[in-house]
């Protein structure tokens, strides 16, 4: 039984180390910065939709949550165009 608990604690330790290394690699490569800029951009609804995978709009009311200042639904593309 002691052997199992030792393996489990070692596995948790390895997982924590690996997740920290992945986070540092993303910071060094600048990937986090690209995602933050795209998520903050309210003028580019297409990029934010690609990152968050929001369902396509069908009516102007569907864009009320994506566009705090208002917007309209582009029926052809299924995206919200914000004002």
Curated annotation (Swiss-Prot):
In Swiss-Prot or TrEMBL terms, this protein is called Putative defensin-like protein 257
Per the record, the similarity remark reads: Belongs to the DEFL family.
Tell me where the transmembrane regions lie: none
Keyword Secreted assigned to the entry: answer is yes
Q: Which domain of life is it from?
A: Eukaryota
- Asked if the keyword Magnesium belongs to this entry, the reply reads no
Which keywords fit this entry according to its UniProt record? Antimicrobial, Disulfide bond, Fungicide, Plant defense, Secreted, Signal
Q: Where in the cell is it found?
A: Secreted
Give me the disulphide-bonded residues. Answer: 57-73, 63-80, 67-82
Q: Which GO terms describe its cellular component?
A: extracellular region
Where in the sequence is the signal peptide annotated? Answer: 1-25
Q: Which GO terms describe its biological process?
A: defense response to fungus; killing of cells of another organism
């Amino acid at each position: 039984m002691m052997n199992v608990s030792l393996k489990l604690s070692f596995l948790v330790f390895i997982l924590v180390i690996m997740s920290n290394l992945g986070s540092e690699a993303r910071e060094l490569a600048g990937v986090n910065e690209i995602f933050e800029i795209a998520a903050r951009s309210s003028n580019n609804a297409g990029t934010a939709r690609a990152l968050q995978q929001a369902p396509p709009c069908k009516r102007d009311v569907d864009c009320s949550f994506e566009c705090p200042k208002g917007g309209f639904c582009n029926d052809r593309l299924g995206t919200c165009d914000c004002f």
